């Protein structure tokens, strides 16, 4: 089969108190029993086309460990059915491409692994995650979580760390832009009480199995249908499901 590198996104999990997000969205009506837990989806793109956006927002949720290799730390998010946790969380990520990690087929994978291992090191090498208040990150100050009212919910615990040291400068610049811009659009998104936990690297695959545009079969391997997130054709549950439907329809149409 043929492989090709593809753009993906990296960043952090940001957490706010759910009550703050509800107030930012609903104003005086926040807390009304008829209203659902507040959700958000925010994005911005600079003049060069690089994007920063929120992804997989989890109202009343928790930040969970998602590592798949030793000596790495990876964050993800989830909500339970009741969505009644104290915090809201979402991935806050920046798009990256070959200009960031190189043009080799597996250069994106290597970049991803470096970030995940560096997060492991910053977290104290015991699978805690590095975390920092949004306020100290934006002010380039010492990472002090004690001043933030939001308690990080990462399942393995956190360790205060300077998240600037985790990312290259272009990614830090976009994260800073996103925090400031999104806080203007949704008051409380990036206030002094919000916290960030790293590292978020699994929004989509950094590599793609090349498939024929008409048959959807892998180039050089008849009968193999690359599909969904792992194959590089989706970035989330819904888009993976849609891609699966497309593949199924193609197979049905052949027989």
Please annotate each region the language model reported.
Residues 1-255:
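Residues forming the flavin
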């Amino acid at each position: 089969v043929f492989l090709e590198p593809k753009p993906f996104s990296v960043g952090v999990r940001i957490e706010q108190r759910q009550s703050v997000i509800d107030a930012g969205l609903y104003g005086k009506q926040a807390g009304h029993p008829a209203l659902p837990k507040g959700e958000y989806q925010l994005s911005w793109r600079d003049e060069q086309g690089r994007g920063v956006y929120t992804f997989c927002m989890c109202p009343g949720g928790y930040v969970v460990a998602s590592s798949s290799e030793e000596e790495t730390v990876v964050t993800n998010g989830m909500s339970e059915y009741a969505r009644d946790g104290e915090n809201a969380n979402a991935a806050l990520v920046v798009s990256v491409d070959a200009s960031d990690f190189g043009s080799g087929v597996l250069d994106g994978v290597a970049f991803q692994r470096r970030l995940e291992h560096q997060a492991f090191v910053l977290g104290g090498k015991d699978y805690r995650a590095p975390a920092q208040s949004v306020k100290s990150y934006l002010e380039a100050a010492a990472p002090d979580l004690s001043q933030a009212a939001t308690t990080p919910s990462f399942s393995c615990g956190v360790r205060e760390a300077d998240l600037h040291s985790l990312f290259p400068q272009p990614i830090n610049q976009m994260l800073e832009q996103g925090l400031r811009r999104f806080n203007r659009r949704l008051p409380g998104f990036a206030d002094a009480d919000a916290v960030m936990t790293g590292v978020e690297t699994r929004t989509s695959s950094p590599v793609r199995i090349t498939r024929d545009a008409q048959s959807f079969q892998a180039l050089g391997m008849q009968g193999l249908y690359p599909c969904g997130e792992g194959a590089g054709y989706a970035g989330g549950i819904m888009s993976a499901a849609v891609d699966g439907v497309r593949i199924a329809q193609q197979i049905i149409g052949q027989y």
